[in-house]
């Protein structure tokens, strides 16, 4: 016969439940005005309220009086401008209990105070010290100059990039093609362009081109681009000794010795 063994019972862990202890409170709900301090935003558990649109000549004692009806108030702080010393038109009211702060927020929001309609919301943070407010105002005053420098640098870089940008290659290419491939006007009365270029290439690449170029001032050219000698050369050669120099059309010299009868 098997013995009956009761199920194993694990003792509760410390800090969560157990004898004589209550479970932990639920997390606060999101939004304004929930249980336990009026919302689950950061800093709502400290019981600080932000009061906007208060008169500039309002004193902390005057603002403390209507809020003390909901519970004990720890502090009332009215921020002032660091340079001018004038109030900035809003205040922080900090309660001892966060629940009292939630009740005051629901009751005092959109109420009339000193002839003005005030707005009461749960502060996202506790009130700042004067040193923190001083640093914040300095950073705000420096922002416009920095933004101007950034915008100036941006416009300068854009102008430099525009000035350094090359021209469009398509336009230059089209202009070059229009100039290089346009046919030249045909001359009247002369030989065609192709024949003249062919004759020029024959003359320029002939072996005796250098000699022909040296004697170019003393030669005449006819219509068929043939080079002929002037009559003065033959008479002069006969006087010198009967030697006649005949020149070929290609520009090379060939000497023939003629013996005159004596």
Curated annotation (Swiss-Prot):
GO molecular function: identical protein binding; mRNA binding
PTM section of the record: Phosphorylated.
Keyword Transmembrane helix included in the entry's annotation: no
Modified residues (Phosphotyrosine): 209
Keywords: mRNA processing, mRNA splicing, Nucleus, Phosphoprotein, RNA-binding, Spliceosome
Stretches with biased composition (Gly residues): 31-42
Biased composition range(s): Low complexity: 1-14, 243-262
Domain of life: Eukaryota
GO biological process: mRNA splicing, via spliceosome; RNA splicing
Stretch list, region Disordered: 1-48, 123-262
Biased composition (Basic residues): 153-167
Domain RRM: 47-125
Annotated positions of the Phosphoserine modification: 5, 10, 22, 182, 204, 206, 254, 256, 260
GO annotations of cellular component type: cytosol; nuclear speck; spliceosomal complex
Basic and acidic residues biased stretches: 125-152, 217-239
Locations listed in the record: Nucleus speckle
Disulfide bonds listed in the record: none
Misc: The splicing pattern of the pre-mRNA is regulated in a tissue-specific manner and by development, and changes in response to various types of abiotic stresses.
Family: Belongs to the splicing factor SR family. SCL subfamily.
Record function comment: Involved in intron recognition and spliceosome assembly. Probably active at the 5' splice sites.
Subunit text: Component of the spliceosome. Interacts with RS2Z33, CYP59, CYP63 and CYP95.
Record's protein name: Serine/arginine-rich SC35-like splicing factor SCL30
């Amino acid at each position: 016969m098997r013995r009956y063994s009761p199920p194993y019972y694990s003792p509760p862990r410390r800090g969560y439940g157990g004898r004589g202890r209550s479970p932990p409170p639920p997390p606060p709900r999101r939004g304004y005005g929930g249980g336990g301090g009026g919302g689950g935003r950061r800093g709502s558990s400290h019981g600080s309220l932000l009061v906007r649109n208060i008169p500039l000549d309002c004193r902390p004692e005057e603002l403390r009086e209507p809020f003390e009806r909901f519970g004990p108030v720890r502090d009332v702080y009215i921020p002032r401008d660091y340079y001018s010393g004038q109030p900035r038109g809003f205040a922080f009211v900090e309660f001892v209990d966060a629940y009292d702060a939630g009740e005051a927020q629901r009751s005092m929001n959109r109420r009339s105070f000193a002839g003005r309609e005030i707005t009461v919301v749960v502060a996202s943070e506790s009130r700042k010290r004067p040193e923190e407010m001083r640093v914040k105002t300095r950073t705000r005053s420096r922002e416009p100059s920095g933004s101007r420098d950034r915008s100036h640098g941006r416009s300068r870089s854009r102008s430099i990039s525009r000035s350094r940008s090359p021209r469009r290659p398509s336009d230059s290419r089209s202009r070059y093609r229009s100039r290089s491939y346009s046919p030249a006007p045909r001359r009247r009365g002369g030989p065609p362009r192709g024949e003249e270029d062919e004759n020029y290439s024959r003359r320029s690449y002939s072996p005796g081109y250098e000699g022909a170029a040296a004697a170019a001032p003393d030669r005449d050219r006819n219509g068929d681009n043939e080079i002929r000698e002037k009559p003065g050369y033959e008479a002069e050669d006969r006087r010198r000794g009967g030697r006649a120099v005949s020149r070929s059309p290609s520009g090379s010299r060939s000497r023939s010795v003629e013996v005159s009868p004596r």
